[in-house]
């Protein structure tokens, strides 16, 4: 993943997110699970065969989804793709649990709750997608602590306490893009 080599480049995560929503999820056949191909030219190739050589790869995507949500390095956590769930993260200072709550992409509201047995000095990087309609304020326990521009990461470096809550909302707008 190029994102691991260049973590400040949001465009790599955007490509992963776009592929997940527009290709991986779109490849599902309602009658027979994940069994047809969605080519990038917009056509879908259906077959009468139940299994193809790539069927295992399509299924593997869903098993690897947790790897796409967060990137961790030392005491820095990047929140890359938004989905409800729980991360148990072993930092240099101990275990931190991060609970993410969202209905993304149906709405842009996202909450992160941190839990630990002691305060931790951490850096949290929250992805602000390139398609966000405007800058995004990030609130810690109700107070703005960072603002992120579309196509970047909002960064919060501080000592976090157990029970801290981060809230932000990705403003979405309907846009049309030509397919090249």
Regions found by a protein language model. Name each.
Residues 110, 152-156:
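Short strand-edge motifs at loop-to-beta-strand transitions and within beta-strands
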Residues 144-150:
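Short beta-strand segments within Ig-like beta-sandwich modules, predominantly Fibronectin type-III
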Residues 160-163:
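Short, well-ordered loop/turn sites that connect or cap secondary structure elements
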Residues 170-180:
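Glycine/proline-rich low-complexity spacer/linker segments in large multi-domain proteins
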């Amino acid at each position: 993943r190029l994102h691991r080599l260049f973590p400040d480049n949001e465009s790599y995560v955007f490509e992963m997110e776009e592929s997940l929503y527009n290709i991986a999820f779109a490849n599902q056949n309602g009658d027979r699970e994940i069994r047809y191909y969605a080519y990038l030219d917009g056509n879908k190739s259906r077959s009468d065969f139940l299994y193809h050589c790539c069927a295992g790869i399509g299924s593997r995507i869903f098993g690897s989804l947790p790897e796409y949500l967060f990137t961790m390095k030392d005491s820095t956590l990047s929140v890359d793709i938004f989905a409800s769930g729980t991360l148990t993260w072993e930092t240099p200072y101990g275990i931190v649990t991060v609970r993410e709550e969202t209905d993304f992409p149906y709405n842009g509201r996202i909450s992160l709750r941190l839990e630990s047995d002691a305060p931790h000095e951490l850096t949290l990087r929250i992805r602000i997608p390139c398609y966000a309609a405007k800058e995004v304020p990030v609130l810690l326990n109700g107070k703005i602590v960072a603002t992120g521009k579309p196509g970047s990461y909002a960064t919060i470096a501080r000592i976090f306490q157990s029970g801290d809550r981060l809230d932000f909302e990705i403003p979405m707008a309907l846009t049309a893009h030509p397919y090249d």
